[in-house]
Amino acid sequence: IAFLVDGKQFTGSRQINYISNSICFIGTVSMGMLWCMYVELRIYRNYKRMVQKAGVEIFPWLVEVIMVLCNLFGTGIMFKISGENVYQRTAGVLVGYISLVIYFAYSIYLVYHSKKQGVNLNFFPVIYFVGPCFAGVVLQFLFYGITSSWVLVAVALIFVQMQSYAESLYMDELSGLYN
């Protein structure tokens, strides 16, 4: 919706532009947080542990949400919408990019740290998700105006789903033994 109303003048277009861009910012950082929660749950298979760790994992998300909510009052922390209803990102957008990189790095850390702890992970496709998503974030950061991150998130989720499906074909979920 944000791209459809950007630069268009009609009743409520500016408000729609603010709200839709705010949802995009929150959605993007939410994807990083949810990925970390998924990795935690997938590795340890323990909801209680995941909820305990969520208190730490949610911090970058909260910072981003607070900044986006402040932005709705016209502060221009994350982005500005001009009088002509044209979107322009500002320096605060770096917080979102940094948050995503933190989430990506943390998910990779979780996998490698759990392997050192002796958790049995045959193959966990953390790079299958992080690789395309990171590429999308970098492209979107460098080339203003393109939205490659969401397309590459979809590709990454397909990679992860395919790997999970392939693993479930040859491994018993209950015992962890190979078929």
What do these predicted regions represent?
Residues 34-38, 74, 97-118:
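Alpha-helical transmembrane segments in multipass membrane proteins, preferentially the mid-helix core
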Residues 64-106, 140, 146:
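Extracellular-loop-to-transmembrane junctions of the mid-late helices
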Residues 109-168:
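Interfacial "cap-and-anchor" motif at the non-cytosolic start of specific transmembrane alpha-helices
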